[in-house]
Amino acid sequence: MPRKKVTDGSGPGNGAARPANRKKAAASGKKRSRHEFSSDEDDLDGSPGSDGGFQGHNNKRGPAKGATKAPTAVIVTEPEHSKEKIKLEGSKAKGQLLIFGATNWDLIGRKEVPKQQAAYRNLGQNLWGPHRYGCLTGVQVRSVASGSCAAHSLLITVEGKLWSWGRNDKGQLGHGDIKRIDVPKLIESLKGEVFVHAACGRNHTLALTENGSVYAFGENKMGQLGLGNKTDAVPSPAQILYNGQPITKVACGAEFSMIMDCKGNLYSFGCPEYGQLGHNSDGKYIARAQRIEYDCELIARRIAIFIEKTKDGQILPVPNVVVRDIACGINHSLILDSQKRVFSWGFGGYGRLGHSEQRDEMVPRLVKLFDFPGRGAAQIYAGATCSFAVSEMGGLFFWGATNTSRDSTMYPKAVQDLCGWKVRSLACGKSSIIVAADESTISWGPSPTFGELGYGDNKAKSSTTAQEVKTLDGIYSDQVIMGNSHTLVVARDETEQDKEKLKKLPEYNPRTL
């Protein structure tokens, strides 16, 4: 456990962070999502519902049973039509890319490599400690992207160029084909654009340019690319169908996507199964032969209603929500607004929404803990089945579950192991967590792991408590990102001392076909 002097003992939520009683948490009878991770299922390839026939954007069937009734007092106004011109700036970070964890991209989350990918069966390995990619010598990286259910990754260079690598059986790398790529490769068709941000779903990708345009590629059978159709796979980048204000942030769940515009409006598209799109419906309907299908959103649709629930169960609209940040788990969503409030919605299993119950939420609902003076949130992060927030006082809060076979935390609780640390970047994998705080990098996660914790060869492979990553001692992590079972770090290399430290790390030069 990393030890540090507590600097914010009077901050909110510094009580004991004991996990909630799991028996109580399970009392609602919430069944486990079939898209949740399982050791014996193909987690990364599962997709909700059935593809079925075409389900158009306007084919609405109203709220599903159990959906929150929309407050009638809310007046919805569409965003202004006068489109602004913006120039977004990317991350201020600049450094070298480090990788550790599983790199057999076609095997991650699966019992075996699919037959169509058999040629790649023996490629890749588990990297138990940080490595440098040999092919990236001299390449300065600004930011990286992956996702808690993703087996592919992207990086953005200081020049704003987009590179990708990893699993590619749905074209999620954007190179116009479905061939796996083991080392980062520039996306040639996008080299004329300058990118500032990217996000990865299970098998799809969104990338944001400096002028607020969004490119999408990869799997699209649930409409998660926002192209107005349900083409199974789109291997070449295409701009989403959207004509509103410039976009400033993108996020991806497993089979859905979120975008935020420069006015603070929020839009979603893709699979609505657990209400994760925020449109007061799970989109479920009975199709032919009593099959359940989903009315997917094929183009970006604005989320217009935000609510809070009182102790007596009364539902009240929350006006004047201006979105400032978004984060998505497998099938739940979080936002941070201009008043430092946090809202969550989607699948409620394991308490990942933070509302002290496991009910699914069909529209964004206020997380009460952060709605008090001095208790607002400054950062939000979504894991596969959990959520994190950093308070404006610097405290790190957690809710949900990282190990779904153990106790769940039904509402935000302080992470005592990191009390007093200044968190600047946090990422969640399938069940592992990594944090960049102060001058250290800290990680933890239950077994099984594949090296994503970075503890090194001949060291413990897992930890249920936060541990400093000693293999990164003296190396400053500007950004940390996790995929399903791998970790990416943007390591600062501004000084000669930085460069010398990084040179001592081993190079990774994977065998390719």
UniProtKB/Swiss-Prot annotation:
PROSITE patterns: RCC1_2, RCC1_3. Its main location: nucleus. One of its GO terms (molecular function) is small GTPase binding. RCC1 repeats lie at residues 94-156, 159-210, 212-262, 264-338, 339-392, 394-438, 439-492. GO terms for cellular component: chromosome, centromeric region; cytoplasm; membrane; midbody; nucleolus; plasma membrane; spindle. Residues 1-70, 492-513 are annotated as: Disordered. It is a peripheral membrane protein. The keyword Ribosomal protein does not apply. GO terms for biological process: cell division; chromosome passenger complex localization to kinetochore; positive regulation of attachment of spindle microtubules to kinetochore. Residues 492-506 have a biased composition (Basic and acidic residues). Residues 309-316 are annotated as: Required for interaction with RAC1. It is found in: Nucleus, Nucleolus; Nucleus; Cytoplasm, Cytoskeleton; Chromosome, Centromere. Residues 20-34 have a biased composition (Basic residues). It comes from the Eukaryota. Interacts with RAC1. Interacts with CORO1C. Multifunctional protein that may affect its functions by regulating the activity of small GTPases, such as RAC1 and RALA. Required for normal progress through the cell cycle, both during interphase and during mitosis. Required for normal attachment of kinetochores to mitotic spindles. Required for normal organization of the microtubule cytoskeleton in interphase cells. Interferes with the activation of RAC1 by guanine nucleotide exchange factors. This is Protein RCC2 homolog.
